[in-house]
Amino acid sequence: QEVFMWIEGNYRRNLMDMHIDDWNPEFLSRINIDEYVDALKDAGIQAAMVKGRPHTGLAYYPTKTGRMHAGLKGFDFFGTMIQKCHENGIAVIAYFTQIFDNWAYETHPEWRLVTGDGKGMREYRGMSNFKTGRYGIVCPNNAGYRQYVKDCLTEMNTLYDFEGMFLDMTFFPEVCYCPSCRRKYMDDTGRELPRKIDWKDDEWLAYVYKRDQWIAEYAAFATDCVKAVKPHVTIEHQFSRITGSWIDGSTEDIMKAVDYAGGDYYGGFLQQTFINKYYKNVSPNLPFVYHTSRCDPELVYHTTTKTEEELLLHVIT
């Protein structure tokens, strides 16, 4: 039980979302860690989630796996934040993106999630369900991508000491028909991967269930990568998609790969009242984590801020 000591009574947490590319050399070039940590202290933050590798796939620390964000000019943002937070009594949760990784998508086309149209996700524009062109999405069933994940997580846990990790985006944003998925389905079932959605077809239902198993198995794989290096580091996988559609492949089996439940939601405090009750019942340990933003109503509207009353409702719910 000692490994969970840091989460006991730790309720006031913060994440500064920083999925920032480096096509403009000014991006992140003037980031001020002292101001950042001072703001955390001023807010009484007990644990800071610090970006290590965001959706861009560009590391915020000097890395031998993939590529570092060019705007940092070699500055170890991740490591320095960990040090400064610990000096000020703030626990650190390291952030690592999964499946949503633009660097991996662009550098390794063979890792890409392939839609029913035969396209990668960045080939779409202006559509819903992550088909906006912003996110490069790769397949968790691809062996090359899994090795990359293992290398990244091993590197982060070898170079740095932190209390926990948030492994984000543990779900399928689309049905994938890549060679890895087709081969894996054949190996698992001896059948071709079905391509027609038919809820009266037993083969289709078996495939949907198999996708659920794949996501849970991937979550266990990623958790094992961390625990192999730092057994005491707590793990939180993105679990918000449990309330999404069948496409996501998110089930309560993911709870077998975490130390506590957590996920981000943007449906207001009424949604929060339900999720809080649900998470309390499925989380292996307490407290669970309910993430939400100051943006109104969600992250897309990043220039807006909820009223003080709305934020208070989130705090007391």
Protein language model features and the residues they cover:
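Glycine-rich, aromatic-flanked loop segments that form ligand/cofactor-binding clefts
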Residues: 2-3, 10-13, 44-52, 76-130, ...
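The substrate-binding groove and active-site-proximal loops of carbohydrate-active enzymes
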Residues: 15-31, 59-76, 131-151, 200-218, ...
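Catalytic domains of carbohydrate-active enzymes, especially glycoside hydrolases
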Residues: 31-56, 159-160, 310-317
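An active-site-proximal structural segment forming one wall of the substrate-binding cleft
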Residues: 39, 43, 84, 137-172, ...
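Aromatic-lined carbohydrate-binding/catalytic grooves of carbohydrate-active enzymes
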Residues: 41-76, 100-118, 122-123, 174-186, ...
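Hydrophobic targeting/anchoring helices
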Residues: 51-54, 216-217, 229-232, 236-317
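Aromatic-lined carbohydrate-recognition surfaces of secreted/lumenal glycan-active proteins
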Residues: 91-103, 166-170, 205-248, 265, ...
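Active-site-adjacent "subsite" loops/lids of carbohydrate-active enzymes
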Residues: 94, 98-160, 190-208, 220
